[in-house]
Amino acid sequence: MSQLVYFSSSSENTQRFIERLGMPAVRIPLNERERIQVDEPYILIVPSYGGGGTAGAVPRQVIRFLNDEHNRALLRGVIASGNRNFGEAYGRAGDVIARKCGVPWLYRFELMGTQSDIENVRKGVTEFWQRQPQNA
């Protein structure tokens, strides 16, 4: 199975979700000067920022990570977290990334996610990779 790549702010909500998920994952560094490059296809798990529009919805660190053409080329799908208090903007980073990168928006969950979210993502990620061609 290919990997998960995620970003978590200092609130650590996404980090806690990843820990509960119990699947191999690589973290995009919080420090903007640190860079990572992936070597296999991955699903991105990302929090949504801001309270409304698309501007600012995607964390800067994630934008920098995806601006690396090599990293962007290996992106296969996106899962977003958010806060339902923001209405239509809930999980907006997933929508923005999916649209701009031409990949499916696979799931969204609120804050740290529920046990049901953990189970849905675990099952969904496994099934997603099983449907992908071997060299994708």
From Swiss-Prot:
It comes from the Bacteria. One of its GO terms (molecular function) is FMN binding. GO terms for biological process: protein modification process. InterPro entries: Flavoprotein-like_sf, RNR_Ib_NrdI_bac, RNR_NrdI. Probably involved in ribonucleotide reductase function. HAMAP family: NrdI. Belongs to the NrdI family. This is Protein NrdI. It comes from Shigella boydii serotype 4 (strain Sb227). The lineage of its organism: Bacteria, Pseudomonadati, Pseudomonadota, Gammaproteobacteria, Enterobacterales. The gene is nrdI.
